[in-house]
């Protein structure tokens, strides 16, 4: 029994022994490389901060800002992490583009530095430098370093937990606090993006597959880790239990699983193909090559096994899901930090020994940086004399503020003519969120109400379904009179919007409102069109309708 315990770790323990032996000799070089990484990350962070106010918010950012104004234990599709982060930054910098996006470059910098120190501990400072350069040359990471989404928070907690778990297994049992701290980091990541829960599978797989680590199942560390994670899951679980488990239904529909599971090979190819675009073709090719080339060493080197298992669960899950319906390329982004370090280790010594590979690596980084610049601002193509033949992806973050200003002026003019206040209904979550953010006079109808609503529906379609709505009945207090126009009532309830007029805003040029909106008002009529143009091209067009005398629809 004792002999087995001595032999089992020998397959992987050589790495730790070599690190201790070479630590002193490598210190001066590590110091200069570390300084270079800090300067590189600091320069990029300064550039990213300068870009935060150059575009309007994306509709996801605007919607997350609405969450931050209405804090809750969870939301329709995600945990509360993004809402609390935006609430913190806007409390300091205000409800503007800089305030909403403040944490994006901060988290990108922190993730880069964590990745460097982790890679340096595993493979040395030079490998860590290459890992940071490759990461920051990736278009999808650069977008997330400027635009505030759940991914910025998710990847930060993922890399942090991966690093602390390595320290836990490396230093156990002398520093046992790494175990619960890792569980906390996984849990915080889960509160930002539920995909982070896959990290538990990674942890358990590493412990189960390495003989010398199986003894951890007899120690409290791993159970403290799981316990800390479970504590973090309580808020979204309780919220979902009170809201018909809507997040589970939403996630099933996102993967098209509510319609059954089919076999669609083209969807898999689409899923994989998109990665070559958002991760840069040469960098992603190098990653795939490096991971495949390192596969045979998964049972020979502990660090390869460790990193592989921090990529496999997420990637395999979404690869299988794409057999049914193509997943978005950012859904499995967490897998590529473990895979990326494997690929870095595979390539960096080869690159140092080959001039051709050094040139290829430089070209790959330059291509990634160029793609990143274009992804962040397509105007660089126009400056270069190239006109986009199709719709500009950057237009998703343009024209919202101007369009909302036009809408607000139209609302003010109509209110002056009619002598009454109008409430706003947008045709979709995206427009309702952008309008709510960019309205100067938000004028909410009551506590928790959004500045702009979406059309009434008995279905729970998004977070708007759980906020106060214009079709909602409130308690009829003693002495209150029911509106004369109110037809459909609830016992002891009253709808305060009955008889009021609204503006309905829809994208495009359709001359009629949807049937459910038309049925809820006595009359509807178009009152104007809002167009936002850029470089002679219309990038946003809204049709605005005046809807007279609201009446509640029958159930």
Show which residues each predicted segment covers.
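Signature aromatic-anchored transmembrane alpha helix within multi-pass, membrane-resident enzymes
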Residues: 38, 349-383
């Amino acid at each position: 029994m004792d002999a087995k315990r001595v032999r089992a770790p020998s397959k992987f323990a050589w790495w730790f022994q070599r690190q201790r032996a070479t630590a002193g000799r490598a210190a001066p070089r590590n110091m200069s490389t570390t300084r270079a990484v800090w300067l590189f990350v600091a320069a990029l962070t300064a550039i990213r901060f300068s870009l935060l106010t150059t575009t309007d918010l994306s509709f996801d950012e605007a919607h997350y800002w609405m969450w931050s104004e209405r804090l809750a234990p969870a939301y329709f599709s995600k945990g509360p992490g993004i809402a609390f982060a935006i609430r913190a930054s806007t409390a300091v910098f205000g409800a503007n583009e800089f305030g909403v996006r403040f944490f994006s470059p901060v988290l990108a910098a922190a993730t880069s530095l964590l990745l460097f120190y982790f890679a340096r501990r595993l493979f040395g400072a030079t490998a860590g430098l290459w890992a940071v350069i490759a990461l920051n040359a990736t278009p999808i990471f650069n977008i997330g370093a400027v635009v505030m989404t759940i991914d910025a928070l998710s990847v930060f907690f993922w890399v942090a937990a991966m690093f602390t778990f390595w320290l836990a297994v490396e230093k156990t049992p002398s520093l046992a606090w790494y175990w619960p701290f890792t569980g906390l980091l996984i849990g915080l990541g889960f509160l930002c993006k539920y995909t982070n829960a896959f990290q538990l599978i990674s942890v358990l797989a590493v412990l189960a597959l390495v003989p010398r680590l199986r003894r951890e199942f007899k120690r409290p560390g791993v159970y403290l880790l799981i316990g800390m994670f479970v504590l973090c899951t309580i808020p979204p679980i309780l919220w979902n239990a009170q809201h018909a488990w809507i997040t589970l239904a939403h996630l099933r529909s996102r993967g098209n699983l509510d319609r059954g599971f089919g076999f669609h090979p083209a969807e898999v190819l689409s899923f994989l193909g998109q990665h070559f675009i958002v991760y840069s073709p040469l960098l992603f090719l190098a990653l795939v090559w490096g991971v495949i080339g390192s596969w045979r060493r998964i049972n020979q080197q502990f660090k390869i096994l460790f990193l592989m298992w921090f990529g496999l669960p997420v990637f395999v899950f979404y690869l299988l899901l794409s057999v049914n319906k193509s997943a978005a390329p950012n859904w499995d982004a967490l897998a590529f930090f473990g895979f990326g370090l494997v690929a870095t280790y595979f390539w960096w010594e080869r690159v140092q020994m080959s001039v051709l590979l050094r040139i290829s690596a430089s070209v790959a980084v330059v291509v990634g940086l160029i793609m990143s610049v274009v992804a962040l601002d397509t105007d660089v193509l126009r400056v270069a004399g190239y006109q986009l033949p199709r719709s500009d992806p950057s237009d998703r973050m343009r024209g919202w503020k101007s369009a909302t200003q036009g809408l607000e002026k139209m609302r003010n003019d109509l209110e002056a003519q009619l002598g009454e206040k109008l409430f706003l209904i947008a045709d979709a979550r995206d427009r309702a969120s952008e309008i709510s953010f960019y309205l100067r006079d938000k004028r909410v109808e009551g506590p928790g109400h959004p500045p702009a609503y979406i059309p009434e529906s008995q279905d729970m379609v998004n977070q708007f379904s759980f906020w106060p709505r214009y079709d909602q009945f409130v308690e009829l207090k003693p002495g209150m009179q029911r509106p004369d126009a109110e037809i459909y009532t609830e016992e002891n309830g009253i709808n305060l919007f009955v008889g009021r007029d609204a503006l309905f805003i829809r994208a495009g040029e359709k001359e009629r409102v949807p049937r459910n909106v038309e049925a809820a008002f006595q009359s509807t009529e178009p009152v104007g069109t809002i167009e936002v143009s850029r470089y002679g091209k219309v990038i946003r067009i809204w049709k605005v309708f005046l809807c007279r005398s609201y009446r509640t629809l029958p159930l």
